[in-house]
Amino acid sequence: MAMQMNSVVHVSTSPSPSPATSPPPEGKQEHGEVAAVHVVGVGDDEAVMVVKDEEAFGGGGVDYSGRAQWLRAAVLGANDGLVSVASLMIGVGAVSESGRAMLVSGVAGLVAGACSMAIGEFVSVYAQYDIEVAAARRRRRQRRRRCDGDGEEEGSGRLPSPFKAAAASALAFTVGALLPLLAGGFVRPWAPRVAAVCAATSAALAGFGALGAALGGASPARSAARVLLGGWAAMAACYGVLRLFANLY
């Protein structure tokens, strides 16, 4: 796997004699070119810049960190939908052998969970969006005061999209929740229905755990076992609590 190297360079912000004679940042150079330089902060006498190696320096030129974060969030959202709906269906199955009751409870859990995930993600990301916009405006005002309006405008950068984050979270939850619904929602006998939900949920939990570990560079087998045990514990707890509640009332 190609590795991307980052280095922090401190350079003086005092005006240089000439742009043509100004030395480049002390970053990694090859073929007379410097890797991409991004200003991340401005102090009183110096600017802090991050130098990212491009493809010519063995870094591949592509930053996969943002993509990995989105994929990991999608895997976690799907895992939430899977465990929530499966536990809900198993819990309802503990007090009723009706296949229709299990199916309706699963659909209700899917809709409620997807809406909850979308709204929560929207509020969270929109708060982050507001914070980053406010920080960018403060940096722009500070730079204008230091440079008397002669400095170049800073790029807006990548700001999070609250609508995209909400849609992705709801979609991931829905995909995970559909698995136990499709596995056991239409099986009429009670025992095969519960077994189908448990089997499909277990297989999906192991797959989601291994995929999340692969995206994070961890051990897939260990992560799959951990997620699988957690899902089993959630389903067992839901079944036991509702069974006890039904016996008491």
Swiss-Prot record:
Domain of life: Eukaryota
Reactions it catalyzes: Fe(2+)(in) = Fe(2+)(out)
Compartments, as annotated in UniProt: Vacuole membrane
InterPro entries the UniProt entry points to: Ccc1_fam
Transmembrane feature ranges: 75-95, 103-123, 167-187, 194-214, 227-247
Spans within the Vacuolar topological domain: 96-102, 188-193, 248-249
Membrane topology: Multi-pass membrane protein
Residue spans, topological domain Cytoplasmic: 1-74, 124-166, 215-226
UniProt GO cellular component terms: membrane; vacuolar membrane
Keywords from the UniProt entry: Ion transport, Iron, Iron transport, Membrane, Transmembrane, Transmembrane helix, Transport, Vacuole
Region Disordered: start-end pairs: 1-32
Compositionally biased residues, Pro residues: 16-26
GO molecular function list: iron ion transmembrane transporter activity; manganese ion transmembrane transporter activity
GO biological process, one term: intracellular manganese ion homeostasis
Role, per record: Probable vacuolar iron transporter that may be involved in the regulation of iron distribution throughout the plant.
Similarity comment: family membership: Belongs to the CCC1 family.
Protein name as it appears in the record: Vacuolar iron transporter homolog 3
Source organism (scientific name): Oryza sativa subsp. japonica
